[in-house]
Amino acid sequence: LEYCGYLKELYGFELNKEDVKNRRYSISRHFLDHVVELKPQAELIIQALKKQEIPLALTTTTSLFNVQRYQDNNQNINAKISFDDDFALILTRENVQNIKPHPEIYLNVLEHFKIEAKDCLIIEDSLIGVEAANNAGIEVVAIYDQYSAHEIELIKARANYFVQDFTELLRHIA
């Protein structure tokens, strides 16, 4: 609520802190339910890896609440994938003490699947995600993301591999 008060003061909103908070959450819910989309061809990567019987984990610094909103309400996403069917493991910020770039979330994946880092490959779209994979000692494929474009050179330098999109990655794994 203090943050909403800060926004009110910073931007001169005529709304009170509570109204700013309500408006913020309304916009956020709309974004989660209707705007967020999978990266193009992501579902094809998921299908290809599942066809090869490779267990998949979804690891995210977002909240479980947001993941559930994507799954339950976002037709852009749930028309293409099923979180429950497509991922053997889903870990969110609530499952770890330390979020990315700390390696904890990826170390938990290794432990869950009882595998070594050399038997795992991470697909990431952010610098902190690439750093988390590096910190866990796991090879990482970075994929271009418009929201990480300002860090693209660092991402390319720290990732083991870089692809522009999932179509490019699909050519290597199919």
Residue ranges, per PLM feature:
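Proline-rich intrinsically disordered, low-complexity coils
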Residues: 40, 55, 101-103
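N-terminal helical cap/lid subdomain that shapes the substrate entry/recognition surface
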Residues: 1-52, 68
